[in-house]
Curated annotation (Swiss-Prot):
HAMAP family: Thymidylate_kinase (MF_00165)
GO BP field: dTDP biosynthetic process; dTTP biosynthetic process; dUDP biosynthetic process
Parts of the chain that traverse the membrane: none
EC number: 2.7.4.9
InterPro entries in UniProt: P-loop_NTPase, Thymidylate_kin-like_dom, Thymidylate_kinase
Keyword DNA-binding: no
SUPFAM superfamilies cross-referenced by the UniProt entry: P-loop containing nucleoside triphosphate hydrolases
Lineage, highest ranks first: Bacteria, Pseudomonadati, Campylobacterota, Epsilonproteobacteria, Campylobacterales
Annotated protein name in UniProt: Thymidylate kinase
UniProt source species: Sulfurovum sp. (strain NBC37-1)
GO MF terms held by the record: ATP binding; dTMP kinase activity
Protein family membership: Belongs to the thymidylate kinase family.
Role, per record: Phosphorylation of dTMP to form dTDP in both de novo and salvage pathways of dTTP synthesis.
Length: 191
């Protein structure tokens, strides 16, 4: 089973992945970008926000996604693989950047993922107040420097994309307690 934990920065995905693997050590965890050797190099470029072209940024994310799928997800198709981010983030950020068509983005991601979208998606949804508080506690990367409104637009595009695609999903209130969120995830995944 291939599962995505999706959401904007500081929404609690990584914390929940840690809790899930503590409870179920057999689960394979990974992340995009950066879940492969190539992905780590791509991640450095992407987080530096040094690319002027949003198309180049999109293509680098897609190259990472294709490599990640082939190197991590596909060989473990008989196991539970949980990725901190994936194609939904890619579509959400691309739509927030403007000048991209949803159907085109879906087609490009289908190609990168060999036509294998995740079996389930968990989207962590936050609000302006929580985002502002959590962002203030960390050093910002190039993408986070685009602003809070930008990040919340990305989040809305993620939600809309999941609904349009009809992939089984759970929307989580990321402002809830860590324990309540964890319990909701366990119940949804039935693990």
């Amino acid at each position: 089973m291939y599962i995505l934990f999706e959401g904007i920065d500081t929404c609690g995905k990584s914390t929940q992945m840690e809790l899930l693997t503590q409870k179920h050590p057999g689960i394979i965890t990974t992340h995009e970008p950066g879940g492969t050797a190539f992905g780590q190099q791509a991640r450095e470029i992407l987080l530096s926000d040094s690319l002027r072209s949003k198309r180049a940024e999109l293509l680098l994310f897609l190259a990472d996604r294709a490599e990640h799928y082939e190197e991590v997800v596909e060989p473990n198709h008989d196991k539970i693989v949980v990725s901190d981010r994936g194609f939904v983030s890619g579509i959400g950020y691309a739509l927030a950047n403007g000048d991209f068509d949803f159907d085109e983005l879906v087609a490009l991601n289908r190609f990168a993922l060999k036509d294998h979208f995740p079996d389930r998606i968990i989207l962590f949804m936050t609000d302006m107040e929580t985002l502002k508080q959590r962002i203030s506690e960390k050093e910002l990367d190039g993408i986070e420097l685009r602003g809070l409104e930008y990040l919340l637009r990305v989040q809305e595009h993620m939600k809309e994309s999941i609904l349009k695609l009809g992939i089984p999903h759970l929307f989580i209130d990321a402002t809830d307690s860590i324990e309540n969120i964890h319990q909701s995830i366990l119940t949804y995944l039935k693990v």
